[in-house]
Regions:
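Conserved AAA+ ATPase small/helical "lid" subdomain
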Residues: 50-104
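Broad hydrophobic/π-residue packing in well-ordered secondary structure
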Residues: 10, 18-20, 28, 77, ...
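C-terminal engagement/docking regions of AAA+ P-loop ATPases
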Residues: 89-168
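Non-catalytic accessory segments flanking P-loop/AAA+ NTPase cores
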Residues: 28-39, 52, 70-74, 144-168
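Solvent-exposed alpha-helical segments within well-ordered globular domains of core cellular machineries
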Residues: 15-18, 22, 32-40, 60-67, ...
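Canonical AAA+ ATPase core
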Residues: 1-72, 112-117
Length: 168
């Protein structure tokens, strides 16, 4: 989703935002990166680079990783931990509209994928804590009071995670 501040963009409704697995915010490039971008466009080298691109993964490799991810184990106590975090978004005074059950499913899937990327076949509480802000930030609508106090969805998510007891 493009930033709302950009002319010609429209804010997506909550129901559509909820269908995105995660929100990852990209900042501006560094000075050096921006000069590299300019150089690519100045010399038309970007066209040459496009011709030399090779896929990182084949379709078969991607599907294989998906099957591996489905085999990553999530203990029932961690499923409850995920559900408790998401439930907190629905009762927090800082949140006007909390996350739906789809957010719980997304957090579980993202945690499994992250665990797999870390070389494990099981999810830990740390995996859940890591992915939670990315999974929840676009799903939460804060109250006007929370926004006036300088809270962001990421900050609220962090506070909610801190309130939920970590399974042992």
């Amino acid at each position: 989703q493009n930033p709302v501040e950009q002319e010609g963009t429209y804010k997506l409704p909550e129901a559509q935002l909820d269908r995105f697995l995660m929100k990852i915010t990209m900042g501006y490039p560094s000075l050096e990166e921006e000069v590299d971008i300019l150089e690519l466009h100045h010399t038309n080298a970007s066209l040459v680079k496009l011709d030399s691109l090779t896929p990182v993964l084949t379709k078969e490799e991607l599907l294989s990783l998906r099957r591996l991810m489905e085999q990553v184990f999530v203990d029932r106590t961690l499923l409850q931990y995920i559900a408790l975090i998401v439930q907190q978004t629905r009762t927090s005074k800082a949140v006007y509209l909390g996350a739906s059950p789809r957010a719980s499913v997304a957090m579980m899937q993202a945690s499994k994928a992250y665990a797999l990327l870390q070389g494990r076949d099981f999810v830990t509480p740390e995996d859940i804590k890591f992915v939670a802000p990315y999974v929840l930030q676009h799903r939460l609508i804060l109250t006007a009071e929370a926004e006036m106090e300088g809270y962001s969805p990421v900050k609220v998510t962090q506070r909610l995670i801190d309130k939920v007891e970590v399974p042992k």
